[in-house]
Swiss-Prot record:
Belongs to the succinylarginine dihydrolase family. The gene is astB. It is an enzyme of class 3 (hydrolase). The active site is at residues 174, 250, 369. Pfam families: AstB. GO terms for biological process: arginine catabolic process to glutamate; arginine catabolic process to succinate. It comes from the Bacteria. Homodimer. Keywords: Arginine metabolism, Hydrolase. This is N-succinylarginine dihydrolase. It comes from Shewanella sediminis (strain HAW-EB3).
Length: 445
């Protein structure tokens, strides 16, 4: 039986815009009110996904959310026809309308936490959608995320789907963006690293003072219980609150791991030495590579601006590892120099490939944000909805779909236009037929 890690990238939705909704995300705030290009954003994401498929990686796509979200606008008191609701919301509560139009579900690293069957007691692949309670525009995603995941991984013999955690700050959960799995091989039981920003039930514990800590220890522990993980397969690590206050809103902005490599900034964690020792002990006797990037080489500001750590580390069919980095890393002198060096350090990382994902980057999401990692075997892959897997035919069909339905310019003011809603629903209805998802959206029910 073959074992491998698949990547399921989020397809950028038709309402991709720059509304500056994400407090604590420097890029999101800095580009607020800029005019976006949804067509270019979607094509950039598809190009990256197809390139990984062409490298021999298993690559899938996850559908975007329905936006504008009229269901939520109705829940908060707006009534009338769809056009009347959009008009009222634009006049009376423009910030709420912007939240209900976000295409942030493209960042599927926040869609869910995934534990592979090699780690779980029941031998199934487990999925728990993130509740994303810290941000209004993302807190309205989990139900539809669960629908899309269930339609993609649609076989109960192999896949276990959980409801998202209770919608309270004590269980603030941001999904795989705060979760990394280390293992010898993808088919072996691994060590799952859960990184959190605060302890909800311990006011004395360290936490940031400027920006919010979006992940709690309590949420991470709950996910580990739901996924039937052993204590010997889990490590809970506190993120350094100082770096959260410098714009490191998720752990995947400051660290990334793959198989036997953990690539992280020296300021990423609290109590680093003790936690690395715990990882080593639980990992076992196999070779393990810790690549620590010192502040003297790459400052936190440069790491955040370039998204050095929001890169993907993938294991190629050859067994070598490659870093998938945004072109922004090439444009930062210190970061580019470090990436040129990292391939010479004697670790499994032997190459760096750069991709233009600037439409996503300007909203605060790099290559790692755009993908949900799913370690699996070939039997589980055969049980996945095959219409969601990237190949030449799907790439061609989705590009044509984007050309047909997506605008090449979208401003925040356009979001109140009823035509945007019509265009988006028409596109998504067709997409569910292309990807054979069934009725996953509210407007289809």
């Amino acid at each position: 039986m073959k074992h491998f890690e698949a990547n399921f990238d989020g397809l950028v939705g038709p309402t991709h815009n720059y509304a500056g909704l994400s407090f604590g995300n420097v890029a999101s705030l800095n580009n607020a009110a800029a005019t976006s290009n949804p067509r270019a954003a979607a094509k950039q994401g598809l190009k990256k996904a197809k390139a990984l498929a062409d490298m021999g990686m298993v690559q899938g796509m996850l559908a975007p959310q329905e936006r504008p979200d009229l269901h939520t606008l109705r829940r908060i008191g707006f009534s009338g026809t769809d056009a009347e609701i959009l008009n009222k919301a634009a006049k009376e509560a423009p910030a709420l309308l912007r939240a209900c139009c976000s295409a942030s579900s493209m960042w599927t690293a926040n869609a869910a936490t995934v534990s592979p069957s090699a780690d779980t007691h029941d031998g199934k692949l487990h999925f728990t959608p993130a509740n994303l309670v810290d941000k209004l525009h993302r807190s309205i995603e989990p139900e539809t995320t669960g629908n899309i995941l269930a339609a993609t991984f649609n076989n109960s013999r192999h896949f276990a789907h959980h409801q998202h955690l209770p919608e309270h700050s004590s269980f603030g959960d941001e999904g795989a963006a705060n979760h990394t799995r280390l293992c010898k091989d993808y088919g072996n039981a691994g060590v799952e690293l859960f990184v959190y920003g605060q302890e909800a039930t311990n006011p004395a514990a360290p936490k940031p003072s400027k920006f919010p800590a979006r992940q709690t220890l309590e949420a991470s522990q709950a996910i580990a219980r739901l996924h039937q993980l052993d204590d010997e397969n889990t490590v809970f690590i506190s993120q350094n609150p100082d770096v959260i206050d410098q714009g490191v809103f998720h752990n995947d902005v400051i660290a990334v791991g793959n198989q036997n490599v953990l690539f992280y900034h020296e300021q990423a964690f609290l109590d680093t030495k003790r936690k690395l020792d715990e990882i080593k002990r639980k990992f076992g006797d196999s070779e393990l590579h810790f690549i620590e990037v010192p502040t003297s080489r790459v400052a936190i500001q440069d790491a955040v601006k370039s998204y050095l750590f929001n890169t993907q580390i993938i294991t190629l069919p050859s067994g070598e590892m490659a870093i998938i980095a945004p072109t922004n890393c090439q444009e930062n002198e210190a970061v580019h120099a470090y990436l040129n060096e990292v391939v010479t350090l004697g670790s499994p990382i032997k190459q760096v490939n750069y991709f233009d994902v600037k439409q996503s980057m300007q909203n605060g999401g790099g290559p790692a944000c755009l993908r949900l990692r799913v370690a699996m075997n070939d039997m589980e892959l055969a049980a996945v909805n095959q219409h969601t897997l990237m190949n030449d035919a799907l790439f061609t069909r989705l590009n044509a779909w984007v050309d047909k339905h997506y605008r090449d310019r979208l401003s925040v003011d356009d979001l109140a236009d009823p035509q945007v809603l019509i265009e988006s629903r028409t596109a998504l209805d067709e997409l569910t037929q292309i990807m054979k998802l069934g009725s996953v959206y509210q407007f289809q029910k």
